[in-house]
Structure formats: C-alpha cells, structure tokens
Amino acid sequence: MSPRLRLQPEAVGIGMTSQRVRDRLVDRLREAGIVDESTLNAIRVVPRHLFIDEALASRAYEDTALPIGHGQTISQPWVVARMTEAVLQVSPKKVLEVGTGSGYQAAVLGALGLEIYTVERIGDLLRQARKRFRALGMNIRTKHDDGRAGWAEHGPFDAIVVTAAAPALVDELVGQLAEGGRLVAPVGGPGGQSLVQLDRRADGSIEQRVLAPVTFVPLLSGMLD
C-alpha cells in the first residue's frame, strides 16, 4: 500500500520542512522499531509542518509531541506510526478516528487511500483541520461531536483509532468495530497509560494486547466550539 497523496510544491516547504529532514525522521522511526514501509512512506509524504503553528515549524520533524492549543497536542510521530502500522495489519478500508486534533493522524491514514471518518469535540481545532485537509486535497469526512459516541451511522468500521486516553476502552466505540476489525487506543490515567490493541474476531470473540507505554491527553466528554 503506497501513499496516494500528491502535494503541490508550495505544500512541501523548505529548510526544516525539506524532504531531507523528513527522511531523517523516517530513519529514526525505523530505528525505533517501525517496520511497515507503507506507514513510513506516509509519514515521509505528509507535511507535518502544516499541522502545527508556524512558530514551531523548526520542530515539526522531531519525534516529539507538540502543543496545538486548547490543551491538546499533535502526537509524537512514533506514536502515529505505531498506531497506523497496527491498523494496517488488518487491511482496513473504512477507519474511524476519535479525536481529530490537528488532523495529522487522519492525514497519514488518508494518504494511504483509506476511507477516513474523524470526530472532534473542539470546534476550533476541527475547523483548522478541515482547512488543512482541503489544502492537501484530502477527502476526509469530519464531524463536530463528542468522540466517545463514535459515528454509528457510518459504522461498523474496519479499524478505529482513538487519540486520547480513557480509563478503559469505551464500549460505544468497541460496538462500532466490524468483525475482523481492530481498535487501537491509549488506556489509563495520569499515573500511566498503555497503547492497547483490541481485535474483534469473526466468531465475535474479543482479543486484547498491550503494544507500548504511552502518554496522551485525556478523552473528554461533551463539545466545545
């Protein structure tokens, strides 16, 4: 699976946004254990600098989370890559993302040609993400809503990616996962979180495994404009 995103020259940028800097990030991710080449290529292609404030552009291709306002962050590239790699293992076509944030995770998945639905509770962040998707020519379906409710009318989903941590997996989201599907989400509180992978088998059984220790912002209820 190869990234389908074809960027205009003005979207690529120069200096710290150059291809050489992106290649170095990909090399670091590979050294850190990311092995799926489709995932690495998507990270290389999607311009992370467009998803953060210009004041932080020089740090866009560091393997670190960065603030995006409203108490939220753009996830560390390794985490984005690990979650993407995990869901690609089930060959999904339709993916739900809970917590659009900057839009970067959705863009990485969208660059792989997947059908993406993403839900964000903070209206201002969602409006900014929509502008970025349009600028990149990406047809990503978005919704301003409480992410804990998912997007049932478009379910079930082959894969679900949750980008904020809850004390336990949210039953409403698990219920929107198709047979043979995979949900990847951070689980835990301020004292410690784990990236958890949940698979719904064809016989209806559920299997879980822990992928890695992580740190995410909390998954909150309600909506903000």
From Swiss-Prot:
Principal location: cytoplasm
Any one GO MF annotation of this record: protein-L-isoaspartate (D-aspartate) O-methyltransferase activity
Catalysed reaction equations from the record: [protein]-L-isoaspartate + S-adenosyl-L-methionine = [protein]-L-isoaspartate alpha-methyl ester + S-adenosyl-L-homocysteine
GO CC, alphabetical: cytoplasm
UniProt keyword annotations, A-Z: Cytoplasm, Methyltransferase, S-adenosyl-L-methionine, Transferase
Pfam families referenced in this protein's UniProt entry, alphabetically: PCMT (PF01135)
Active site: S75
Subcellular location: Cytoplasm
A GO BP annotation: protein repair
EC class: transferase
Entry EC number(s): 2.1.1.77
PROSITE patterns for the chain: PCMT
Domain of life (superkingdom): Bacteria
HAMAP family to which the protein is assigned, alphabetical: PIMT
Family: Belongs to the methyltransferase superfamily. L-isoaspartyl/D-aspartyl protein methyltransferase family.
PANTHER family: PROTEIN-L-ISOASPARTATE O-METHYLTRANSFERASE, PROTEIN-L-ISOASPARTATE(D-ASPARTATE) O-METHYLTRANSFERASE
Its biological purpose: Catalyzes the methyl esterification of L-isoaspartyl residues in peptides and proteins that result from spontaneous decomposition of normal L-aspartyl and L-asparaginyl residues. It plays a role in the repair and/or degradation of damaged proteins.
Protein name stated in the entry: Protein-L-isoaspartate O-methyltransferase
Species of provenance: Stenotrophomonas maltophilia (strain K279a)
